[in-house]
Amino acid sequence: MSIPLRLLILWLFCCMHAHAVAADFSATIASVKKSVVGIGSHKQTRSPAVVFSGTGFIVGDGRSVITNAHVVTASMKGDPLETVGIVIGRGEGFEFRPARVVSVDAEHDLAHLVIEGAALPALQLGDGALMAEGKELGFTGFPLGMVLGLHPVTHRALLSAITPIVMPSLSSGKLGAGAIMQLQRARFPVYQLDATAYPGNSGSPVYDPQTGIVYGVINMVFVKGLKESAITSPSGITYAVPIVHARDILQRKSGAAK
């Protein structure tokens, strides 16, 4: 077989493989979107009645929801007439379903909610082992909230680094109060992604494009604020909390906090 023919066959094989990978990702997105929900609150006397605060995703038995703790806190204002819950549906045709906050992990900025009513399609969680740098990933959420209707948006991402949530600074004056508090706790690794996300993406699942298995939770407020406290202009870097911490919070009893 001549060298040009071999190169042609190799090129065709690469093209076919790339097409198959793209097709797999499209199928994964369609499946994952069924499990991605908005997080917010409902108050009948307010206009609009439903206020969006972030993204979450369904796990376990189809009634458990994982999101960021700060997303839930934003929805809990102590008003007895206000109810925390999830928002499902597409476009303008969305539905609000009440939820109960089961447990909150302030250290890793995660929360576990349980919804009322029928179960929804659930995502599978990874085994908790840290991923290898260089892995291609995807994440789906609501970067713009409900401003233009409830439309989930998917982004590709590259796991560019695994770093401590807070790095000791050469100058203590560059560390904010939150960073100093975190240094006093046990530091844990977070995923640094080569992708752009927005505050509405907080709580979005980070998953394998081929399998849909979730390996992390996007965090655009808590982690980003700690990691970039010494930077005058925040970067476009996206961070995610490893899924092992979501696995831990799912095992806690109702009302437990950390």
Whereabouts are the PLM-identified features?
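Short, conserved beta-turn/loop elements at beta-strand boundaries and strand-helix junctions
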Residues: 61, 104-108, 162-168
